[in-house]
From Swiss-Prot:
It is a single-pass membrane protein. Pfam families: Glyco_transf_4, Glycos_transf_1. The keyword RNA-binding does not apply. This is Alpha-1,3/1,6-mannosyltransferase ALG2. Mannosylates Man(2)GlcNAc(2)-dolichol diphosphate and Man(1)GlcNAc(2)-dolichol diphosphate to form Man(3)GlcNAc(2)-dolichol diphosphate. The lineage of its organism: Eukaryota, Fungi, Dikarya, Ascomycota, Saccharomycotina.
Length: 458
């Protein structure tokens, strides 16, 4: 079921940059717009030099309110100022009359504004990527105490929504454990991936990619930010234990030399390679683009068993995914995880940890049982188990190179395409429009008072 009429839909998002949450908002807005609805995004910040192309080129209508307000005070009180900026945005939208003709507001990340839109008689659908309080760092009792009012307000402001949705069943389970006072049972709307496989690879990336494939025709690929929680060492340890002949490991991902953890973790990974007697090279993508290396020098850098690449372009990432043997997706308890879908859409198999989001995206191989639907392997985060899976994957691919070619794309189109996501949004929007609130005006006003007290006192 979908809404019977075309709707006026507004998104509210704190910072319209280039992160995963922003990609979801842009995809949802595009999908609903393509379905004939009138869509606008309200945000507190949007840098046209640091945003997705659909925002930059005007395909999506975006209005910014409150960008003049600070985001912190001396690198502190980020949550306070995030709430303050959203309250300013909300006031501008409501008091200017922009909210009057909107059929529904889709709000994500911060729920502070929800009771204000409800007081203005708007319908609200809240998209919960993950409970914010579970992401907050609490290094001491002062910070823990500081977070209490924000944690409570997250729960009670979200409760004012007409409908709440989450990005995976894993997030749904965490939602239920975290928001114990909420009676809402959220539906799941999976993020989508671009199903277009005719990606244009730029000339320099094509040259770099061909040089790598020429030296390493059979390689496993790991794509993650250089952060310890991504557990990249699991891929390296399993690769060393499996000792699959004529195979290399390419590790690439986000890296900022200004971030201490990025630098330190990459050093730890190279030390691990030394301990495991694996040759390695570290290659910074920016050096390739600036022509700091000749073709011959680049080719030499790709002669090691383990090849580290930092902050590669989307173009080169697409090339590597298209040409890899297997994706090694190492993080545990990922809220969702989009990279496995990026591999599956090209018909490439995935080896992932058997918890969190990948349990919902990857269909684990079972011999003579699910060969028409399998998209890879799911194993516990144990190097021995992963090594066994690598050996098995080599055998399976040697026997049936085309096994995953159709399974991955079919699953992505059915469950994780923009069309599928749009249909789910339309279904849940209809539920929000039909929802008859049993929340009293006294409750809403009380929550608004608490929000204002929280922001201006804490």
């Amino acid at each position: 079921m979908v809404p019977a009429k075309k709707l006026k839909i507004a998104f509210v998002h704190p910072d319209l940059g280039i992160g995963g949450a922003e990609r979801l908002v842009v995809d949802a807005a595009l999908g609903l717009q393509e379905a004939g609805h009138e869509v606008i995004i309200y945000t507190s910040h949007c840098d046209k030099t640091h945003c997705f192309e659909e925002v930059k080129n005007g395909t999506l209508k975006v209005e910014v309110f409150g960008d003049f307000l600070p985001t912190d005070l001396g690198k502190r009180f980020f949550i306070v100022f995030a709430n303050l900026r959203q309250l300013y945005l909300t006031a501008k939208v409501v008091l200017s009359g922009r909210s009057k003709d909107k059929d529904v507001f889709i709000i994500d990340q911060l729920s502070t504004c929800v009771p204000f839109f409800k007081l203005a008689n708007n319908k609200v659908l809240f998209y919960c990527h993950f409970p914010d309080q579970l992401l907050a760092i609490r290094t001491n009792w002062i910070k823990s105490l500081y977070r209490i009012p924000f944690d409570l307000l997250e729960q009670f402001t979200m409760y004012c929504s007409d409908e709440v949705v989450v990005n995976s069943n894993f997030t749904k389970s965490m939602y239920k454990k975290t928001f114990k006072y909420l009676q809402k049972n959220p539906n799941v709307i999976y993020p989508c991936v671009d199903t277009d496989t005719e990606t244009l690879i730029n000339d320099r990336d094509m040259q770099i990619g061909n040089l790598l494939v020429g030296k390493c025709p059979n390689f496993y690929l790991s794509i993650n930010r250089y952060e310890r929680k991504k557990n990249i060492e699991l891929a390296i340890q399993a690769f060393a234990k499996a000792s699959v002949e004529n195979t290399n490991l390419v590790v690439c991902g986000g890296y900022d030399p200004r971030i201490h953890e990025n630098v330190q973790y990459l050093q730890e990974l190279t030390c691990l390679c030394k301990e495991l007697d694996l040759s390695y090279t570290v290659n910074h993508y920016s050096d390739f683009i600036e022509d700091s290396y000749s073709v011959n020098e680049i080719e030499k850098l790709f002669g090691a068993k383990v090849i580290f690449l930092t902050s590669i372009s989307s173009s080169l990432k697409e090339f590597l995914i298209q040409n890899m043997q297997l994706l090694l997706y190492t993080p545990s308890y990922e809220h969702f995880g989009i990279v496995p879908l990026e591999a599956m859409k090209y018909g490439k198999p995935v080896l992932a940890v058997n918890n969190g989001g990948p349990v919902e995206t990857v269909v684990s191989y079972q011999k003579e049982d699910n060969e028409k639907s399998t998209t890879g392997w799911l194993r516990s985060a144990d190097a021995d188990e992963w090594a066994s899976a690598l050996i098995e994957s080599k055998e399976v691919l040697n026997q049936n190179p085309e096994l995953f070619k159709n399974n991955g794309p079919k699953r992505v189109i059915e469950l994780f395409s923009r069309k599928a996501m749009t249909q789910e949004f339309e279904t849940n929007i209809k539920l929000a429009l039909r929802h008859t609130s049993n929340i009293s005006i006294i409750y809403v006003v009380s929550i608004i008072f608490a929000v204002l007290l929280k922001v201006f006192v804490f």
